């Protein structure tokens, strides 16, 4: 099964299955001298961890174990290997789907490709979103390394089901949405999202949503014409996330309804520098980052595992039947998905920053390491929850 690695210079390989002993990641290409601790990784992992309010009831602690690549809280330049053990596995929930593939899931395509006898039906196996633990671990490393360029990445849930954000949001609000149980950047939206989640849970159903990720101060010129354009690289990275069904940046599909005179973003002087008036392009022109905020959005489909009965085929007799999926599943996978999107944006940007020479390939100087650590600590402090009146 190829296709488990991502990136060229900053290369990430994830491994493990939902109900196997552990999931994990190997990160190759991290320069030596980057300050990095288990706590740095846990900070990001916490926001995709199950067992919290409004997400899957699977109670995993998600404690990362660093196996290699770090010594005295600094990267050594060798591959970084990290695992997270699966400690709350109940495979008995999945005995029924052993013979009844779930609608909306990868069950049947995996059986068709790899063979029924080779299919790990427990929790979805390799197709499970549990795989994204490795992405978030690598994303934490990438986010910290990007602090060398003072590049910050944060996301929020722009819509959930029929409810959506219809007003401007500040980057500070997006940062603080990490502590919203539904990743809302506004208090009024948080209440609407929570009501939807409660309704879906009661009905045995689920909702989809749109995640938006904003990158502040991205290095200029990232991306390589023609086939490695930044928009193409981000699209591939984000579309590889389980349950993601669509991608856009800037104005996205809205530009298809506009005239050129409306969609073109005028070039102006901003703070004694050349810039764009409205950033309609979302920070990418000609496939290159232009220094404006990098704004991407993606659509998550509703969680496929729902209690409502749905038609399927019993593989033992090839007769039509019904399945009601039991177990512990997210009523809206988009909530935890926001952190995964952040991670894939970070992995894409850090790889291109290294290719462009913005980040050193071999090692960080002691001064660079200290700068990174100071900025990282400021980032962590900035993610503290706002007072209710500020949300």
UniProtKB/Swiss-Prot annotation:
Its cofactor is FMNH2. Keywords: Amino-acid biosynthesis, Aromatic amino acid biosynthesis, FAD, Flavoprotein, FMN, Lyase, NADP. GO terms for cellular component: cytosol. Reduced FMN (FMNH(2)). FMN binds at residues 126-128, 286, 301-305, 328. NADP(+) binds at residue 48. InterPro entries: Chorismate_synth, Chorismate_synth_AroC_sf, Chorismate_synthase_CS. It comes from the Archaea. CDD domains: Chorismate_synthase. Pathway: Metabolic intermediate biosynthesis; chorismate biosynthesis; chorismate from D-erythrose 4-phosphate and phosphoenolpyruvate: step 7/7. Its EC number is 4.2.3.5. Gene3D superfamilies: Chorismate synthase AroC. GO terms for molecular function: chorismate synthase activity; FMN binding. PROSITE patterns: CHORISMATE_SYNTHASE_1, CHORISMATE_SYNTHASE_2, CHORISMATE_SYNTHASE_3. GO terms for biological process: amino acid biosynthetic process; aromatic amino acid family biosynthetic process; chorismate biosynthetic process. Belongs to the chorismate synthase family. This is Chorismate synthase. It comes from Saccharolobus islandicus (strain L.S.2.15 / Lassen #1).
